[in-house]
Regions:
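Intrinsic disorder in cytosolic terminal tails and internal cytosolic loops
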Residues: 1-16, 462-480
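12-transmembrane solute porter fold
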Residues: 17-43, 53, 57-63, 73, ...
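Conserved MFS/SLC helix-loop-helix module at the cytosolic interface between two early adjacent transmembrane helices
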Residues: 68-105
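Membrane-helix interface residues
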Residues: 78-82, 135-138, 168-170, 203, ...
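Short hydrophobic/alpha-helical segments at membrane-entry points of transmembrane helices
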Residues: 106-114, 366-371
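Cytoplasmic helix-loop-helix junction between adjacent transmembrane helices
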Residues: 116-149
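Hydrophobic transmembrane-helix bundles of small-molecule transporters
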Residues: 167-278, 282-284, 289, 316, ...
């Protein structure tokens, strides 16, 4: 049966894979944009809700936390008969989160809304599973590639509009707009998404609980470590408990009949390469956007910064998204000449160049724009091919699960990067001041550069030809 006919599209859209592909990409863009909506608004959140820099960072961290917990469960649901319901339920949850954030009811309600929005991170493995199961071969690979890129590009797509709305109508206007977009996305998904396969996808409840508790503990340590003290009993105890829970989860999954994530499939070389490079790249590149947003909005009286508006800060991130999509086009056209591993190497080089530029030259807008464009191109290269490495190495029935682990690795990496950059900025605030020192930005950029160099080293290692027959047997294509 052709891929496009594996499910039945409701209504008049049946048999139109181009429409399905467009909706899947739109869902990925919308989910990522909404989940990262707080980034350009952090300084505004601090002012409106009268919270500290560390507290405002929770507008990002809590979305990442709920995304990390929800993604593996949604990924497993995406491999069975509840795939369509999982997509619709996730979009509806995001819609509810947008409405809560749009209500001026205090910081606690705002954070609750952001937590619900974080479920949107789980849409990426769901959309990938739908694409692999329901699109024809000639459209499937390109759609999966674009979905992979939008998970990064979506971070900057809506920033200028968010800045314009916040500047003209206040903090809550962008969330009303996001609620409207979520409602449109829900309507489109209801009209276009195909029916799910008949076979059930059993959710490993025990594995979900162990993984959820372990990830939650780990992310809490990363978020609260600076306030608790990295050597404090609660930080060390929470870290040990999180590691123990995650170790228990691995042991549980290896014995489970229907594991939440089939860990043995993750040992295949292309899958390992995708997850390792995606994790390191995410830790390395993710700090740049919040650093740039805060840097350009800092008053020039502080000795650095441009005193820019929220709108201008959002515009600084637009080159990131444009370059990400441009990279996906370049990757698609060069697919016959360059392997996925080589593309990842090229992406890592561009990422290192972007961070080095921000480290040594950030005195003019054009330097910021150039750094963000290089950052976007590098991310676009890496995240265009990572999903193809995974989907080409696992059975179709494990697509959602395998992609959920990939998304989970990136979400944890984003949390590490967010906590790291926030900690470095807080530590750089001089006594008696409320703004970070310029040196704090340099330190964050320097550490990010070192992490990206590690990502480059890993990508070069995976780009080497395989000579061990035992390893070569784990690199072949998956058989559905």
């Amino acid at each position: 049966m052709p891929a496009a006919q594996a499910g039945v599209m409701p209504g008049s859209w049946a048999g139109k894979p181009a429409v399905l592909a467009a909706v899947l990409v739109a869902l990925a863009v919308e989910s990522t944009a909404v989940a990262s909506l707080g980034t350009p608004l952090l300084p505004t959140i601090e002012t409106v809700d009268h919270v500290s820099l560390a507290a405002s960072q929770w507008a990002l961290t809590i979305a990442l936390l709920t995304g990390a917990v929800a993604t593996p469960v949604l990924g497993r649901l995406g491999d069975g008969r509840l795939r369509r319901q999982a997509v619709l339920g996730t979009v509806a949850t995001m819609l509810a989160g947008c409405v809560l954030c749009a209500i001026p009811a205090g910081f606690a309600v705002f954070l609750t809304g952001r937590a619900l929005q974080g479920a949107g991170f789980g849409l990426v493995p769901l959309a990938t599973a739908v694409a692999r199961h329901n699109l024809p071969a000639e459209r499937r690979g390109h759609t999966i590639m674009v979905i992979g890129v939008t998970t990064a590009a979506g971070i900057g797509i809506g920033y200028p509009l968010v800045g314009l709305l916040a500047q003209g109508l206040g903090l809550y206007a962008p969330f009303w707009f996001a609620a409207a977009l979520s409602a449109l996305a829900l309507a489109a998904a209801m009209a276009v998404l195909p029916s799910s396969p008949a076979r059930p996808a059993r959710v490993d409840a025990g594995g979900a609980v162990l993984l959820g508790l372990g990830i939650t503990g780990l992310l809490l340590v990363l978020a609260e470590g600076p306030g608790w003290g990295w050597a404090s009993a609660i930080t060390v105890g929470s870290a040990i408990a999180s590691v123990a829970l995650l170790a228990g989860w691995v042991a549980w999954e290896l014995r489970a009949r229907s594991p939440l994530i089939e860990l043995r499939l993750l040992c295949r070389r292309p899958v390992v390469a995708a997850n390792v490079t995606a994790f390191l790249v995410a830790v390395g590149f993710y700090p740049l956007a919040p650093l740039v947003v805060r840097f350009v909005q800092t008053p020039a009286a502080a000795g650095y910064g441009f005193g820019a508006t929220v709108l201008i800060a959002g515009l600084m991130l637009t080159p990131f998204s444009l370059a990400s999509f441009a990279a996906s086009t370049v990757v698609r056209r060069s697919a016959r000449h360059l392997s996925a591993e080589v593309v990842v190497v090229i992406g890592c080089v561009a990422l290192i160049a972007s961070m080095v530029l921000f480290l040594v030259a950030r005195d003019a807008y054009w330097q910021i724009v150039t750094a963000m464009a290089l950052d976007g191109f590098g991310v676009g290269c890496v995240y265009a091919v990572n999903p193809l490495q995974i989907t080409g190495s696992v059975p179709a029935g494990e697509t959602g699960s395998a992609m959920s682990f990939y998304q989970l690795a990136r979400t944890v990496a984003y949390s590490i990067a967010s906590a790291l950059s926030a900690t470095l900025l807080v530590l750089s605030i001089p006594p008696g001041h409320h703004l970070p020192a310029n040196a704090g930005y340099s330190t964050a950029a320097l550490i990010s550069t070192a992490i990206l160099i590690a990502a480059l080293a890993a990508s070069l290692l995976f780009a080497l030809p395989v000579t061990n027959p035992a390893v070569r047997r784990t690199t072949g294509p998956a058989h559905d």
